[in-house]
Amino acid sequence: MYLMKDITRDGAKVLRETAKPVTFPLSDEDKQLAHDMMAYLVISQDEEQNEKYHLRPGVGLAAPQVGQSKAMAAVLVPGDDNEILFKEVLINPRIISNSVQHAALAEGEGCLSVDKDVPGYVVRADRITISYQNEAGEHKKIRLKNYPAIVCQHEIDHLNGVLFYDHINKEHPFTIDPDAVIIK
């Protein structure tokens, strides 16, 4: 299981590189990576475990964030009443289509790899379709909207060497299209 000390911080070269594709069948090392990234998310979202291990809660974790230049990310988006909106390890993910409609989180975005607060709207597509492989190597395609779509775009950005604050308008950080969806 990963702890906060294992999270690669902003400034590390691996966070700005394009991650390498993952080959199948998965190596034991890649299986462990997938397991450990998802385990971090599960434990970080459990209040008691989070406190015990001094973790920052997360909804996504990409391999570059643990120092691995591999195109793999774990996503665990909780909903209301312990419902899970989306839980998957995405391997070699690609956004194959996106909506014209924009969206942003009202509170802005954060990142386990970025310790400072960076205020501003991170403007993203409100709806996306992604293709990826699961841990068994099966090719999948899924359509996501709102918060799960934003989380997946954030994680896929990590695999392309992009950090959330790269999307914030430097001159006017809270400027956004008036038709954009603001997710609270």
Swiss-Prot record:
**Enzyme Commission number, as recorded:** 3.5.1.88
The UniProt annotation places Fe cation binding at 111, 154, 158
Cofactor entry: Fe(2+)
Annotated active site residues, numbered on this chain, are 155
Q: Where are the transmembrane segments?
A: none
Which InterPro entries does the entry link to?
Peptide_deformylase (IPR023635), Peptide_deformylase_sf (IPR036821)
Q: How is the cofactor bound?
A: Binds 1 Fe(2+) ion.
The answer to whether keyword Kinase applies is: no
According to its UniProt record, this protein's enzyme class is hydrolase
Q: Which GO terms describe its biological process?
A: co-translational protein modification; translation
Recorded catalytic reaction(s): these are: N-terminal N-formyl-L-methionyl-[peptide] + H2O = N-terminal L-methionyl-[peptide] + formate
**PANTHER family to which the protein is assigned, alphabetical:** PEPTIDE DEFORMYLASE, PEPTIDE DEFORMYLASE 2
Alphabetized NCBIfam families for the sequence? pept_deformyl (TIGR00079)
Protein name per its UniProtKB record: Peptide deformylase
Please name the taxonomic classification of the source. Bacteria, Bacillati, Bacillota, Bacilli, Lactobacillales
